[in-house]
Amino acid sequence: MSRRGTAEEKTAKSDPIYRNRLVNMLVNRILKHGKKSLAYQILYRAVKKIQQKTETNPLSVLRQAIRGVTPDIVVKARRVGGSTHQVPIEIGSTQGKALAIRWLLVASRKRPGRNMAFKLSSELVDAAKGGGDAIRKKEETHKMAEANRAFAHFR
């Protein structure tokens, strides 16, 4: 038996302005080359644009977008008897949120547009309304899981 202790799960800190953990998770994913202040600027500009577009609370739009994109099931490649199967596996809420944030950022980076704040705000508004690339990615993942339901016992 291992004598090594189990690692404690780190809790996400909240950001200085909105006091929200989701915002901080999003900032940490936007972050490139250690430029956190730039990541905060991008997100806060995106939030202002969301406020202007929808005229509702931008944090509720953000929550709704992430809730809409969060997957319940993902597929993992499992090698069984020389062949690789895509095995559907349920994931927890934290992992699901992390995936949702990653998908939202990938989708917004792919978008044509002026700057990242504009693209991110557009993607978040679309995701909150039930459209956009990130939602399509979630549906695609769920379809894959449904198609490979026969391999669920390989968990």
Curated annotation (Swiss-Prot):
An example GO CC term for this entry is: chloroplast
Q: Name one GO biological process term.
A: translation
Q: Which CDD domains match?
A: uS7_Chloroplast
Q: Where in the cell is it found?
A: Plastid, Chloroplast
The source's domain of life comes to Eukaryota
Q: What are the protein's GO molecular function terms?
A: rRNA binding; structural constituent of ribosome
| Classification via Gene3D superfamilies | Ribosomal protein S7 domain (1.10.455.10)
Keywords (A to Z) from UniProt: Chloroplast, Plastid, Ribonucleoprotein, Ribosomal protein, RNA-binding, rRNA-binding
Q: What does this protein do?
A: One of the primary rRNA binding proteins, it binds directly to 16S rRNA where it nucleates assembly of the head domain of the 30S subunit.
HAMAP family reported for this sequence:
Ribosomal_uS7_B
- Quaternary state and partners of this protein? Part of the 30S ribosomal subunit.
Tell me what this protein is called. Answer: Small ribosomal subunit protein uS7c
Q: Which organism is it from?
A: Lactoris fernandeziana
